[in-house]
Amino acid sequence: GGQYIFITNNSSKSVNDYVEKVTKMGIRAGYENFYTSSQATAMYINENYPDQVVYCMGTRSLVNELREAGISVVTEVDDRASVVLIGFDTENTSEKIRNTCIMLGRNVVYLATNPDFVCPVSFGYIPDCGSMSIMLKNATGKEPFFIGKPEPIMVNCVLKKLGMKAEDAVIIGDRLYTDIKTGVKAGVDTICVLSGEATTQDIEEGDVKPTYVFDSVKEIYEGLTEA
């Protein structure tokens, strides 16, 4: 059988949170089956800005993930911080936003975990990290460098982790501007499922084209079992 990893841009939760979530859904998965934008961000900071203090506007899970990776993290205005990082912060407050604007007024590196505009919830959608970055741009004029999808960083890390070549992998997702685009950038075949955000019209009219299109993950499974 093949290998699989869930790649998520959601930096608001820990890997353990995701393992628990999919287990409740009846899906067998362990820690090794997930790779998050939080993990990718920690790796990116350690490789590009080692030993620097990072100001983070994010959830406690994101802050803990960074600290566990050996990164010095502050969550208040701090003169030592040379890197500002924002994530999908479901614990956000007006004070956090104010502090982030203060920090962005300084000569700092500005990073963000992911460019997603919205996150699906039970009643519809809520603003994700991409929307928060637009809000901060309107206030400060600053734009971040995004770590997660559609940048190929996460995919390249996963391929290396699995010891797999790009031509032997496929990315499945429902968002053209993150899931599918990251596959295109990483040189990996893609499958767009129409059970989420993307529609047939989006694919026809958009610049990002998936390799394959299926109505749902179930249809992919049925196709594989029949093969």
PLM features: what roles do these ranges have?
Residues 2:
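Conserved phosphoryl-transfer catalytic core
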